[in-house]
């Protein structure tokens, strides 16, 4: 569990790996859990790579869980946060307990990945505001077999600086946008939403727009 602030400086060419595993065969298990308002900071002066990973197997609950407001910050180097699920558990889940802020300095990157190899729940489920700040880049990628790649409900993508790319890939529906979804990208920034479905079923789509989705300065790719 990550509580408070986790700060790291990783030198250029070096790698810091932090991995949590939930091996429960029953009940609720979380691979990597963030407590309220937790922050992970890859500090300036490094230039290396930081990988955080949460892994769940059969019977577990969530690979990476951010239940409240949180911050991921990369000021020098690249950060990857990955949820892996081999069961019906979510690979990456963030509820509506506050905004998730992705802060990247120019030349730095944050990549969120949810990878799921079984049916059940979606690879990534986000129910909150995603704030992208800082001049660098960030991406959110959900890859699923048997369910939706990325499920969003009642969410705002708010890109005030830099670029954010949202990618959903599935053998069912790539990205499912439910309820009111707001998209915003400031001048000079890019918000790309890309959904890919390998299914031939008429009920599946690259991006499924359910209701009331609106945006400005945004690109949608199917």
Sequence positions of predicted segments:
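Surface-exposed loop/turn motifs in large extracellular/passenger domains
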Residues: 1-90, 94-222
């Amino acid at each position: 569990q990550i509580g408070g602030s986790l700060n790291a400086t990783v030198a250029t060419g070096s790698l810091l790996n932090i991995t949590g595993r939930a091996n429960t065969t029953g009940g609720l298990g979380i691979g990597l859990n963030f407590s309220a308002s937790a922050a992970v900071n890859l500090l300036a002066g490094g230039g290396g790579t930081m990988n955080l990973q949460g892994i769940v197997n059969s019977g577990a609950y969530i690979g990476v869980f951010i239940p409240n407001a949180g911050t991921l910050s990369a000021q020098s180097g690249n950060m990857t946060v990955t949820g892996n699920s081999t069961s019906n558990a979510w690979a990456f889940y963030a509820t509506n307990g506050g905004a998730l802020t992705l802060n990247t300095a120019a030349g730095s990157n944050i990549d969120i990945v949810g990878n799921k190899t079984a049916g059940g729940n979606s690879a990534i489920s986000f129910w909150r505001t995603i704030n992208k700040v800082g001049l660098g880049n960030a991406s959110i990628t959900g890859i699923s077999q048997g369910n939706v790649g990325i499920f969003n409900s009642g969410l705002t993508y708010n890109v005030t600086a830099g670029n954010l790319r949202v990618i959903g890939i599935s053998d069912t529906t790539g990205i499912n946008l439910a309820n009111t979804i707001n998209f915003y990208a400031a001048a000079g920034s890019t918000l790309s939403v890309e959904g890919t479905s390998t299914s031939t079923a008429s009920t599946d789509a690259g991006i499924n727009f359910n209701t009331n989705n609106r945006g400005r300065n945004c690109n949608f790719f199917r």
